[in-house]
Amino acid sequence: MTSTLDLDKGCTVEELLRGCIEAFDDSGKVRDPQLVRMFLMMHPWYIPSSQLASKLLHFYQQSRKDNSNSLQMKTCHLVRYWISAFPAEFDLNPELAEQIKELKALLDQEGNRRHSSLIDIESVPTYKWKRQVTQRNPVEQKKRKMSLLFDHLEPMELAEHLTYLEYRSFCKILFQDYHSFVTHGCTVDNPVLERFISLFNSVSQWVQLMILSKPTATQRALVITHFVHVAERLLQLQNFNTLMAVVGGLSHSSISRLKETHSHVSPDTIKLWEGLTELVTATGNYSNYRRRLAACVGFRFPILGVHLKDLVALQLALPDWLDPGRTRLNGAKMRQLFCILEELAMVTSLRPPVQANPDLLSLLTVSLDQYQTEDELYQLSLQREPRSKSSPTSPTSCTPPPRPPVLEEWTSVAKPKLDQALVAEHIEKMVESVFRNFDVDGDGHISQEEFQIIRGNFPYLSAFGDLDQNQDGCISREEMISYFLRSSSVLGGRMGFVHNFQESNSLRPVACRHCKALILGIYKQGLKCRACGVNCHKQCKERLSVECRRRAQSVSLEGSAPSPSPTHTHHRAFSFSLPRPGRRSSRPPEIREEEVQSVEDGVFDIHL
């Protein structure tokens, strides 16, 4: 690094820019390429590229006033380096490209042909393909057979084509996509990264589907063996990302529970499987994987999820700026971010050592394009080997390796403490929903008849008199809110919002019911209630103010209220479930896995 800059103490953008200019000599040779590349790659984290271009123009004009021809030349060398190292920025950012063209026009106007010749903005190739997201096939095409490709490919050939598919998708990811993800914590307005994550999940799901598509345990064991060898070949190709996807599919609960199937897998295959699983386990912050990646030479495909997790951890741990005025950027953080992003950027500069067949790629793309939920996969697993089936007792049987925390939670986020304002907000929303749906005559009160209807859905609700404080024969909104506020301390403030959450890997993007942002299944950020199916982020779990409406216990209120017109009859279906205020445990009731149902996106709406 340039000796005049102390990144650990922080520096201004202008100081860094000046240091990058001074890193060049008059002939264009870079004395400190690491500093220059780091700043040009990382500056969008702090200021827009168009603003950096304006600063460069200002530096050039200032050096012209100072009659510093050397500084002018170095500035032009920096612009040339910027265009050469990051051409996609100039093709995909019209405002930035226009500013550089203005600088070049100024040089031409002043007769500085030598300086102008260094800036070749017109020769930048198009990178529009990096912003084009492959559209998935229509839903009606999903149910075709998946064995067309699988049965005819050797493990290495399949590993090579999977590598090519993911590499092609990965090359479309730009710095701005990483920055957006780390900033928002999700893939809002980030279709390229979202599509790559979807492809990762598709591979993991396809592995499960291929295994579960076989009717006999022996056949399923052969498929498992085949995929273990595919994973072995992926490791040989140093493709850790797809290796993670395949191992994740093999270690999924829908596969790991197949005891009879695993009894037909050879001990050697089990041993190989265990070794591959151990390589990508989250133990020690993925220490095994990191050591193996660091030793790689040539092409390697890192596990994107691990490195995105590192970026998120840095973003949470360290500030971007060291002063309240946001003038001195955190150079230490910038250096650490650069190391992670440079490792990812290196992937696109090294082509994988594979030759892909276009026809096979098309078949594989169709095979991966499936829409199966976690519940559907598990139900298929139960069909293959029901729970009542006794496990084999053969002395030669092998058990699958324990499912590792392959991709653990991103960061340890402390659960927010529930204050009274938040509890009141939750309760008010719940009570408003109760009145909207159960106040049949719309008089703003719950009568005894209406209360009995509610009790059908709220089995733990206290007696009518406990809520009717003034004993006037009906319950007002204020009385119901007061009742739940009194009871909330027993249940930790969660009341009717107790859900039976489990981690969810949704192939399709789904929205969090609290913050409305998208949930990415690949990184286990999402939770899904096994009773009502509501989705939310882990960090939104404690703030979710949506009742748990168990579909299996829905109540029909047909004909419970007079119809407003003779031609319209109201049908109301509800599935609410509230705990009894006196209960000390806030744990939701256990739900058998047979009761888990596939949930469509709009299932939580009240149908009137």
Swiss-Prot record:
Binding site for Ca(2+) 2: D468, N470, D472, C474, E479
UniProt note on tissues of expression: Detected in megakaryocytes, platelet and neutrophils but not in lymphocytes (at protein level). Isoform 1 and isoform 3 are detected in brain basal glanglia, heart, lung, spleen, liver and kidney interstitial cells.
GO biological process: cellular response to calcium ion; small GTPase-mediated signal transduction
Record CDD domains: C1_RASGRP2, EFh, RasGEF, REM
Domain N-terminal Ras-GEF: from-to ranges: 4-126
Ranges where the Ras-GEF domain occurs: 154-387
Domain EF-hand: 426-461, 463-490
Membrane topology classification: Peripheral membrane protein
Keyword terms of this UniProt record: Calcium, Cell membrane, Cell projection, Cytoplasm, Guanine-nucleotide releasing factor, Membrane, Metal-binding, Phosphoprotein, Repeat, Synapse, Synaptosome, Zinc, Zinc-finger
GO cellular component: cytosol; neuron projection; plasma membrane; ruffle membrane; synapse
SMART domains hit by this protein: C1 (SM00109), EFh (SM00054), RasGEF (SM00147), RasGEFN (SM00229)
Binding positions (Ca(2+) 1): D439, D441, D443, H445, E450
PROSITE patterns from the UniProt entry: EF_HAND_1, EF_HAND_2, RASGEF_CAT, RASGEF_NTER, ZF_DAG_PE_1, ZF_DAG_PE_2
GO MF terms, alphabetically ordered: calcium ion binding; guanyl-nucleotide exchange factor activity; zinc ion binding
PTM-bearing positions, type Phosphoserine: S116, S117, S147, S554, S575
Positions annotated as zinc finger (Phorbol-ester/DAG-type): 498-548
Location in or out of the cell: Cytoplasm, Cytosol; Cell membrane; Synapse, Synaptosome; Cell projection, Ruffle membrane
Region (Disordered): 382-405, 555-596
Record's comment describing the protein's domains: The N-terminal Ras-GEF domain mediates association with F-actin.
Purpose of the protein: Functions as a calcium- and DAG-regulated nucleotide exchange factor specifically activating Rap through the exchange of bound GDP for GTP. May also activate other GTPases such as RRAS, RRAS2, NRAS, KRAS but not HRAS. Functions in aggregation of platelets and adhesion of T-lymphocytes and neutrophils probably through inside-out integrin activation. May function in the muscarinic acetylcholine receptor M1/CHRM1 signaling pathway.
Assembly and interaction partners: Forms a signaling complex with RAP1 and BRAF. Interacts with F-actin. Interacts with RAP1.
Matches recorded under PANTHER family: GUANINE NUCLEOTIDE EXCHANGE FACTOR, RAS GUANYL-RELEASING PROTEIN 2
Homology family: Belongs to the RASGRP family.
Name of the protein: RAS guanyl-releasing protein 2
Organism in which the protein naturally occurs: Mus musculus (Mouse)
